[in-house]
Amino acid sequence: MLKRLYLILTFLTFSLLGFSKEYKVYGPQGGLAMEVTLPDNFNVDTDRCPIVILMHGIFSSKNIVPIPAMAKALAKEGIASICFDFGGHWKSEGDMEYMTVGKEIEDALAMWEHAKSLPYVSKIGLLGHSQGGVVASMTAGILAARGESPAALVLVAPGSVIQDACKGGRFFGAEFSPADPPEYVKCFGIMKLGREYILSTQELDIYGTAKAYTGPVRLIHGSKDSIVPMSCSEKFVETYTQDAELIVVEGENHMITKKLKRVVSHAVSFFASQLK
């Protein structure tokens, strides 16, 4: 009985420590937990389809709205997707305290390389929500500068307001000196935001990097978003030289919990028109 209990405890300990996990993609903080969703009855050996890399917001996860709904709806349209937890988030390796936008861009670029390596992928699109929108926009710009632009880009309530928050010394309930923040602050009283994040976010060239991407763009923003102001999406529209489209979803909030189906529909229909 004691031996059996010991074996169970040992297994649980190794599982919690992450030794039982296997990662296919790695970012600067380590292995990235990811999930590929394919269209129904899709044969990876003989079929081809486009794929969209889905990026969640700060403190969020690949398993939190709106990411799972996006993946499911894309699959119904014959489009595959990759969703993943950024380094330091949930099931990925790393520590939230050491997360930065720059590191998340590296995570996204690693996912891009993985998507390119999949033999069944025809085209690649990017989608980001909140801070994930900032990451997606800058990743698209970096890729465009390299000569390998994504085929389409969707930004849902892109959270470029993070830069103003860090410069202003207030971030999700945490207050700090922008010029000399502590080692970390606690957002919502529990989530650690590191000094490196606060300082580096102030120096980001968000729009300058994003504008290198000249492919098709759709922005989606809820009219009742109390976290990321509409002006962030409007600034992205002004930044892009191409015809970037902004769709305002009446009554929707930042977390996409009121009009989820409508938001998903706007995103998926855009990808269907651009990738297939």
Where are the regions a protein language model picked out?
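Hydrolase active-site cap/lid region
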Residues: 145-195
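N-terminal cap/lid segment of alpha/beta-hydrolase-fold proteins
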Residues: 19-45
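Acidic catalytic loop of the alpha/beta-hydrolase fold
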Residues: 224-228, 255
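Conserved alpha/beta-hydrolase
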Residues: 71-93
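Catalytic histidine-centered segment of alpha/beta-hydrolase-like enzymes
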Residues: 252-263
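Short beta-strand/loop motif that positions the catalytic acidic residue
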Residues: 213, 219-221, 225
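Catalytic nucleophile-loop/oxyanion-hole region of alpha/beta-hydrolase
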Residues: 62-63, 89-119
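The serine-hydrolase catalytic nucleophile loop
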Residues: 59-71
